[in-house]
Amino acid sequence: MRLLYPEQVAYMDLEEMQEIHEDEIALLNEVDKLATQYSKDSTKLDELEAKLDEYIAHVTEHFKNEERLMEKYDFHAYEMHKMAHDMFLMDLGFATKMWREHGDIDKIIRFIRKSPEWIIMHIASVDSPTATYLAQKMAEEK
C-alpha cells in the first residue's frame, strides 16, 4: 500500500508543477517502502540511502524551481510560500541527520509518514493558487 496517490492531491493548472508533484509522490512512496524494509533488514541500507538522496535532491530542485518562477512572475505570496518550503526542508534535513548520525531510522519513517498530510494541504492551499497565477502569467507572455 502506498502512503499517497497522485489522485489525492489537487490538479495543477501548470503541467510542469503537476508532473513534478507526481514524480515526488512516487519517490516518497519508494522511500517509505525502503525505510520500512531497512528497519527489518539492514541489508537495504545502500538502496535506502540512494533513494533518500534522490528524494531530497528532487524536493530541493522542485522548491527552487517554484521559487524561481514565483520571483520571475512577481507572485505576491512568494515569501510565505518559500517559508513553507524552507520549513519542510529543515524538517527533512533534521530527520535525515538523526538517522545518518545516530542510526534512528524511526525519524525518517515518522517524517515520511507525516508528509502526505503536509503535501496534500500545501498543494491544495499554496501550490494550486500559485500554479493558477503562474499559468495565467505565462499565457499572457505568448
Locate the predicted segments by residue:
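Small-residue-biased structural context
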Residues: 1-142
